[in-house]
């Protein structure tokens, strides 16, 4: 019987070049008679039968590999069967079935594509190691990629440039780039995938390389290059995600982190991340505590509470499948300097991170110098780099009205270029970026008139009022306490009198207290008062006799001298 089956096998192999259909029929006859005829299963694979059952039977009978071929005096290389091992990286990466290991590789990759990750990994357990470590590493990288375990993909392909199989080494570069992109490491992904485009694997992996390069470049702000790649994909390898990305410039790759991968309750299920909300809850508590600590700012606190409530309810409605108005998260903080705008911006960053709207409670403080360059065409580049630093957090632009300045009655072209870039990124990165612009109300209004699209980008405007004289006193006391200092009653009275005077005077059309800087004015008074106190105490002949009260107290004379000094320095004296 063995000789008969061997004869049938030899006939089938001989027919493969002329009639694969007839060859497949003969290989099938053999396997119907003997399910352990591994070589016939391999023949079926060589004829295009890569059904799961076929792959399983070939793998299950792999210990019989070469027996029929040996009896027929045929080399298994002569069968010419190849098995797909590219997985998510390419349908065109195949490997010659010249050993039981090749069968195992193909079977494991197919099992992973069906979501049977554990079976796939178990199939590799008895794979021969000596001399074939790179093959096993590649298949593991494919399995981990199918399960979106990107950190382990990188572990498997690290050092692939030393693999003896240069084609698979190049494919490993693609796997590394794909993993980097899914981890949000877009610069590294761009580098790896660009290099892969100049290797033997470029054609086999072309759709994957183009897709992830497009997503990496879009996330880096290179929309023009992303569009070129997406259009090429649409023309050659159309699929729904490509169409969606072409239609919506805000379409982004959904990334993860090593921490999230490690937090999965099921290592193969990306949706099984056990959410640890304690850090977010802590951010919300800290944000509320910081807001409560602020003196005055009644209207601001109410508006921040409304902003938080609207954002929180929108997240809850969306989670329950309800319609949610797509309102902008960008904000305007309008008001004089020293009224707590930067502090409240930090509160907003904590709130948004606590609610999961942004990735981290990051606040990037900026001004005109971070956006506007000295040469034409460079402001766009500079602006994009600044925005990239803020992605995943909040970009705070103080004195935003200085972005675009008038020059001899003409609009500043460099500032306009920066503003145009900012507007585009605010829209394209709206899911990863919150922008807060700050400045005097009238100046902010003038900025909003510069560009027609600017005003519509901001759904929330919060007005910051000047501090009252009483609030300046309270702020001064808080600042002093933080420094282990204390204003005596006379010193506090001096601060109240000075603040009242400034609130009733105008300089250049603005309240003198605003020119002085409100809260910053209070800090300068306290710091100058501490200096005067220290100079007074330094004249004491007996330092050991100085008590804590004496070392901390700022008296009326100390503060009177401080007020005179600060007013002179700020040029706001009588």
UniProtKB/Swiss-Prot annotation:
Subcellular location: Cytoplasm
SMART domains: AAA
Residue numbers binding ATP: 335-342
One Gene Ontology cellular component: cytoplasm
Pfam families: AAA (PF00004), T7SS_EccA1_N (PF21545)
Keyword annotations: ATP-binding, Cytoplasm, Nucleotide-binding, Transport
Highest taxon above the source species: Bacteria
Disruption phenotype: Increases efficiency of DNA conjugation when disrupted in donor strain. Loss of DNA conjugation when disrupted in recipient strain No effect on secretion of EsxA or EsxB. EsxB secretion was not seen in this disruption in strain MDK8.
GO molecular function ontology, one term from the record: ATP binding
Role according to the record: Part of the ESX-1 / type VII specialized secretion system (T7SS), which exports several proteins including EsxA and EsxB. Plays a role in DNA conjugation, in both donor and recipient strains. EccA1 exhibits ATPase activity and may provide energy for the export of ESX-1 substrates.
Record's subunit section: Part of the ESX-1 / type VII secretion system (T7SS), which is composed of cytosolic and membrane components.
Family: Belongs to the CbxX/CfxQ family.
Note, other: DNA conjugation in M.smegmatis is unidirectional with distinct donor and recipient strains; mc(2)155 is a donor strain while MKD8 is a recipient strain. Mutations in a donor strain that alter DNA transfer do not always alter DNA transfer in a recipient strain.
PANTHER family: AAA-TYPE ATPASE FAMILY PROTEIN / ANKYRIN REPEAT FAMILY PROTEIN, AAA-TYPE ATPASE FAMILY PROTEIN _ ANKYRIN REPEAT FAMILY PROTEIN
Protein name: ESX-1 secretion system protein EccA1
Organism of this sequence: Mycolicibacterium smegmatis (strain ATCC 700084 / mc(2)155)
């Amino acid at each position: 019987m063995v000789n008969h089956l061997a004869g049938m096998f030899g006939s089938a192999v001989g027919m493969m070049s002329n009639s694969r259909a007839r060859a497949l029929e003969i290989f099938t006859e053999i396997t119907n008679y003997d399910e352990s005829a591994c070589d016939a299963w391999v023949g079926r694979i060589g004829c295009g039968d890569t059904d799961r059952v076929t792959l399983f039977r070939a793998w299950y009978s792999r210990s019989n590999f070469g027996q029929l071929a040996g009896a027929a005096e045929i080399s298994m290389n002569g069968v010419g069967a190849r098995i797909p091992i590219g997985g998510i990286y390419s349908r065109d990466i195949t490997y010659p079935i010249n050993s039981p290991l090749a069968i195992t590789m193909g079977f494991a990759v197919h099992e992973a594509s069906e979501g049977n990750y554990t079976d796939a990994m178990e199939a590799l357990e008895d794979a021969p190691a000596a001399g074939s470590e790179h093959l096993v590493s590649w298949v593991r990288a494919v399995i981990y990629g199918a399960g979106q375990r990107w950190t382990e993909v990188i572990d498997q392909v690290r050092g692939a440039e030393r693999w003896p199989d240069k084609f698979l080494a190049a494919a490993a570069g693609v796997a590394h780039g794909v993993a980097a992109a899914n981890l949000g490491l877009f610069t590294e992904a761009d580098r790896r995938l660009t290099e892969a485009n100049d290797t033997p694997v470029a054609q086999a992996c072309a759709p994957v390389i183009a897709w992830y390069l497009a997503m990496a470049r879009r996330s880096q702000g290179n929309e023009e290059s992303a569009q070129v790649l997406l259009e090429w994909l649409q023309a050659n390898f159309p699929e729904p995600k490509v169409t969606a990305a072409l239609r919506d410039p805000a379409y982004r790759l959904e990334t993860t982190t090593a921490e999230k991968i490690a937090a999965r309750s099921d290592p193969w299920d990306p949706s099984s991340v056990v959410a640890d909300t304690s850090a977010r809850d802590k951010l919300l508590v800290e944000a509320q505590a910081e807001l409560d600590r602020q003196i005055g700012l009644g209207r601001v606190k109410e508006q921040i509470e409304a902003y938080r409530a609207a954002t929180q309810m929108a997240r809850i409605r969306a989670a329950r499948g309800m319609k949610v108005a797509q309102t902008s998260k960008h904000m305007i903080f309008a008001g004089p300097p020293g009224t707590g705008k930067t502090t409240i911006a930090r509160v907003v960053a904590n709130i948004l991170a606590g609610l999961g709207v942004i990735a981290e409670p990051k606040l990037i403080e900026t001004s005109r110098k971070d956006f506007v360059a000295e040469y034409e065409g460079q402001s766009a580049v500079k602006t994009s780099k600044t925005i990239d630093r803020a992605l995943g957090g909040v970009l705070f632009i103080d004195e935003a009205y200085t972005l675009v300045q008038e020059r001899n009655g003409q609009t500043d072209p460099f500032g306009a270029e920066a503003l145009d870039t900012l507007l585009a990124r605010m829209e394209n990165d709206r899911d990863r970026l919150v922008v807060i612009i700050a400045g005097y109300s009238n100046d902010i209004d003038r900025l909003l008139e510069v560009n027609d699209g600017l005003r519509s980008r901001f759904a929330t405007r919060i007005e910051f009022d000047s501090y009252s004289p009483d609030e300046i006193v309270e702020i001064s006391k808080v600042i002093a306490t933080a420094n282990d200092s204390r204003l005596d009653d006379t010193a506090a009275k001096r601060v109240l009198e000075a603040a009242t005077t400034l609130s009733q005077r105008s300089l250049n059309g603005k309240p003198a207290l605003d020119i002085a800087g409100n809260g910053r004015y209070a800090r300068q008074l306290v710091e100058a008062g501490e200096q005067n106190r220290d100079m007074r105490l330094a004249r004491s002949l007996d330092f050991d006799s100085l008590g804590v009260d004496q070392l901390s107290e700022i008296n009326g004379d100390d503060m009177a001298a401080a007020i005179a000094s600060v007013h002179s320095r700020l040029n706001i004296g009588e």
